Amino acid sequence: MPGAIVGIYGVQRSGKTLIAYKLVKGLQQACKQQGIFLPVYTNLYSPRDPDFRFVNSMDELPLDLSPKVVLIDEIYNGCDAQDYRKLKDISIFINTLGKQNCLFVFTSIDAQMVYNRIRNQMNVVILVKSSSTHIHYRFLYLNTGKYTDFVVEKNAALFEDVYYDTNFIPLDFDWEMKS
């Protein structure tokens, strides 16, 4: 199976990390019900979630054909579209991703802050907007040109079983492939 890319965009505190976490966690749980363990490698600090493996470097990701999810929160911290020194390593990662059994999910404030080769290969874009009472999500399916809107109410139930540290600011992800 070739890799797939989901980009999630929204302003700070809009709910983009929440939907990324719930999407990946839901996929992981669906696989678990089928008897498949789906590892998640992420820069989200989730010490209470044993199924999420904290990584902060390309070298920490296994480059094999086993199914996996890579979730990078605030991707522009390390994958800036203007940082030309890192583009070679990011290009290698994208080429590797295309040949792997990997779902790559990332969040960003703005699409222009993300390297264009990642943007151009996205399969799904999720736009996030938040009010004091609701979070609005628009899922854009780039292969079909269709979209679906979801609105969720902000309440305690929405944040049940959410184990990442919402106050943790992701470090710059190291895109260099040393090995």
Task: Describe these PLM feature segments.
Residues K16-T17:
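Conserved lysine of the Walker
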Residues G26-Y41:
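Post-Walker A helix-loop "phosphate-sensing" segment adjacent to the P-loop in P-loop NTPases
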Residues I8:
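Hydrophobic anchor at the beta1->P-loop junction of P-loop NTPases
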Residues V11:
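P-loop (Walker A) phosphate-binding loop of NTP-binding proteins
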Residues L63-R85:
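Conserved P-loop NTPase "ATPase switch" module shared by AAA+ and STAND
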Residues M1-G3:
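Phosphate-binding P-loop
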